[in-house]
Amino acid sequence: MSKCDVKQNALCKSLGPEYKIMYIDLERCIYRDFGNGFDVEISGTHTTSNRKTATVYLWYVPEKITVKRVSGVKQSESGKVVDELYQFSQKLLRKGITDRDTLWSIRRTASS
């Protein structure tokens, strides 16, 4: 197991049991399924560097669309960002926003 694997596994474990390592688009990422039709991908954590930032993607699985992207996330803050994205996904569901066109428009305005 490489040093990158060990470090990423430790970060994944620190986030909690609902997180796992997955390969997404040929990249080893940290993944969490919210169980509500949305999931998150934490990209850029397969590194030995503590200074390298991650990008967190919120996906709406039924439509296979990225709803929101948060870039420049400190690895130590990734759990907090995922929690915020979970709340955002719950808000979308409460408002009944699950159609592709509306999610696409949110995606264009919500990415940071």
Predicted regions and their residues:
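Negatively charged, low-complexity tracts enriched in Asp/Glu with abundant Ser/Thr
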Residues: 1-37, 62-83, 87-112
